Amino acid sequence: MKVTLFVTCLVDMFETNVGKATVEVLERLGCEIEFPEAQVCCGQPAYNSGHVESAKEAMKHMIETFEDAEYIVTPSGSCATMFHEYPHVFKDDPKWAARAQKVADKTYELTQFIVDVLKVTDVGASLKGTATMHKSCHMTRMLGVKEAPGILLSNVKGLTVKELPNVQNCCGFGGTFSVKMTPISEQMVDEKVDSVMETGADYLIGADCGCLLNIGGRIERLGKKVRVMHIAEVLNSRS
């Protein structure tokens, strides 16, 4: 099975280990990975900021880059959600509507792909300790991926997963929201960190680097002793 990896901007610039872990997990599950070097941003920051025409140019480039893929997989629920928004963005454009739908139909977040397409619930990972998981807004509410991460984490040997209090609450990142509405964003992430600390977990796990950078940055500034891990890194662990 051929998988075309959309690595995302944040993974490319800040969390390269997440990209490496994603590739290693998928290869271990029998996938052949392709990486189009022409890939750029999915267009979400510009689109959410109201720069629709600029965003469309990025989206068109991504459609051209990925439309011949068998499966498109990304370690980001948020960016996968943006791919699924492409048909809406181009619904009135006869040249791009069908091509946008074609790309959206074969785009998956990593855990969604493993559980729903590969039909795998145990990737053979092991990690000792306790963990809690932040469920990102775009991934759960817009993409509709709610169960797959928990299913995979429940089968990580040595790992005990504790429910995060107020798990439905946003961490305050929201892309450009954290820049435009900084005081509100700071209050939200403080509340999220309080919830994480309440669990007493060794690890905070998430499936979106934006959320993890936001929460992890706050945890570090506050001097808390919690390790922040992307779920791809957890699924690639053998400890």
Swiss-Prot record:
<dbReference type="GO" id="GO:0005829">
    <property type="term" value="C:cytosol"/>
</dbReference>
<dbReference type="Pfam" id="PF02754">
    <property type="entry name" value="CCG"/>
</dbReference>
<comment type="similarity">
    <text>Belongs to the LutA/YkgE family.</text>
</comment>
<protein>
    <recommendedName>
        <fullName>Lactate utilization protein A</fullName>
    </recommendedName>
</protein>
<dbReference type="GO" id="GO:0016491">
    <property type="term" value="F:oxidoreductase activity"/>
</dbReference>
<dbReference type="GO" id="GO:0006089">
    <property type="term" value="P:lactate metabolic process"/>
</dbReference>
<dbReference type="InterPro" id="IPR004017">
    <property type="entry name" value="Cys_rich_dom"/>
</dbReference>
<dbReference type="InterPro" id="IPR022822">
    <property type="entry name" value="LutA"/>
</dbReference>
<comment type="function">
    <text>Is involved in L-lactate degradation and allows cells to grow with lactate as the sole carbon source.</text>
</comment>
